[in-house]
Amino acid sequence: MADFEGLFPAIITPMSRDTGKLNEAAFREVMEFNIQAGVHGFWVAGGTGESVLLDDDENMRIAEIAADQSRGRIKNIMHVGAATTERAIALAENAARAGVEAICCVPPFFYRQTDEAIVEHYRAVAAAADLPLFVYNLPQSTGVEITPELMQKIQDAVPQLKGLKHSAPSFPNVREFAHMGLDCFIGSSLLMLPALTIGAIGCVDGPPNFAPELWLEIWDAYNAGDIKRAEVAQDRASEATMLVREFGLHATAKVILSERLGIDCGDPRAPGRPLSKEKQAIVLRRAEELGLTRVAVAQGDD
């Protein structure tokens, strides 16, 4: 297996229902559940992890926990994106100290920047960590699309650049990024199989958090050359993604994981809203219909 490929769930950040702060024990449980299911790595403190709602201490602690809990069994790609270069550098330096395998970063957002400013931002952040860098292409949230043309400028200036998570609607660009020699994760779990066929090296998204087995089946079938089985697996996995689209990612993922693992992952951080009791019941019934039932997570290996 290459350094980075396969299924990398964008992991949630469980919150304490009492304090609203990071629930470290639940975070470790969610990691361990996914590791034992067979995932290849994690995308940590990204959009699914409510990154822009975390303070610096929480972000830094999450990096430490991720590295400690994985203990080299999988690879962690830690999100260090921020609106300012100074803050992103500080988060990148901490990620490197924590011992994660790579960093990822959205472009600077809110204020529109020139291509030159974006390139310099990535150069400075990557140099601070000196780890493999994955660009986080999420224009729906950042207002900035990393086009192949802009990516070429970043590639020319940033020696640490490894690849990207491509969550933009421009699906054909996956092929262009692959032709550039970049490791391109598709950022939509609905498109894992078609993306693999045009050069993606895996999938990073939120729904695999609570149902890693569904997307691992796609990965295994595709790599075995069994496209029909992969198509069936993609259809089944997509039902879980559509559940998230109907009820909201953060609340839905936390409800299902809480039920499957027998823990409390809390609610989305405000202004995010929890699901009503009625909606929780619908989500859990639909999850059970997909076979997403209670699992036992063994103690992680020392």
Spans of model-derived segments:
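Catalytic alpha/beta core domains of metabolic enzymes, predominantly
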Residues: 126-128, 139-247
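Residue-level "edge-of-site" marker
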Residues: 47, 82, 108, 139, ...
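Short helix-capping segments at alpha-helix termini
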Residues: 68-74, 98-99, 129-131, 156-160, ...
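Active-site beta->alpha loop and helix N-cap motifs at the rims of alpha/beta catalytic domains
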Residues: 2-143, 153, 297
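C-terminal alpha-helical cap/extension of soluble enzyme domains
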Residues: 3-14, 37-39, 197-200, 204, ...
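Short, charged helix-to-loop "capping" segments that act as catalytic/coupling loops
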Residues: 15-24, 156-161, 258-264
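A general structural signal for well-ordered alpha-helical segments in protein cores
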Residues: 27, 59, 63, 88, ...
